[in-house]
């Protein structure tokens, strides 16, 4: 597959992106220059990354250029089915994508994968390639409960799978971060179950990617505080989004994602807690509210590009403000 044909998986190539920016004028993106030649020593202790899922409609080069011009420190790159890099092409495509991201002056502190355990398709090829490129972390997860058997028994069955993944991570010197989700049958939604899976593991190789919004969905009054305290010793990455409760078309109460600062998540308290814990690691911005399909990782979007850019710029500014107020900026 040629590079051009492979890039046509996305809705916009670099040439088309630059034409769009030129036609839209300087208002399309803020005038932030690319910081060429970023080194590990110059990266912030909490690099603020765009989750590349929301830029699936851009090819690697315009995606990286957009992230840099908007002011992000880095990229959390999707290396999974439907992502910027497909698992079956990781050895060919991830080095190219990583090079483009780094040439744009961005950090690549992590990738998001579909890996659940060592038996996941292409798991070892992904880890081998990620390690060779000097990417230190990857997002892992996806365990779910079934109706068969007790929850303690199911957790006991998961522990050997986590231990096996730990050994593969040790081999490649990588840290897997389990992403926390809310919802029925999600392992990790209650947080205490995830603690039982990671508490005896080496945090160099097995850790947590804590999503404070999902934690607030599950326990909005005080439980999110308890789960933060419980898992912070194992937390190597954090994901940020916001929500409020609303009735859906059937009259049922559901979490409704919204721009940062317009929902229920207490970011000021959360970042103060992370400051107290001396947290360092990648922070990933997730934008799950309606953005013409960008929120779902679609490869074409139904809104103007500027709508997505404005949303990312607004949420990023709020993150920067909160981090600075907490002494983390």
Which residue ranges define each predicted feature?
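Histidine-acidic metal/acid-base catalytic patches
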Residues: 2-12, 16-47, 58-70, 191-329
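Active-site acidic/histidine proton-transfer and metal-coordination neighborhood
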Residues: 16, 21-31, 62-64, 81, ...
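Hydrophobic faces of well-ordered beta-strands that scaffold small-molecule active sites
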Residues: 46-52, 75-77, 108-113, 138-140, ...
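Active-site beta-loop-alpha junctions enriched in small/polar residues
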Residues: 51-55, 78-82, 113-116, 143-145, ...
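Short, conserved active-site loops that position catalytic residues or coordinate cofactors/metal ions
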Residues: 70-72, 76-81, 106
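Glycine-rich, proline-tolerant flexible connector loops at the mouths of alpha/beta enzymes
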Residues: 78-96
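A short acidic, helix-capping loop that chelates divalent metal ions and anchors anionic groups
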Residues: 82-86, 146-150, 217-218, 293-294
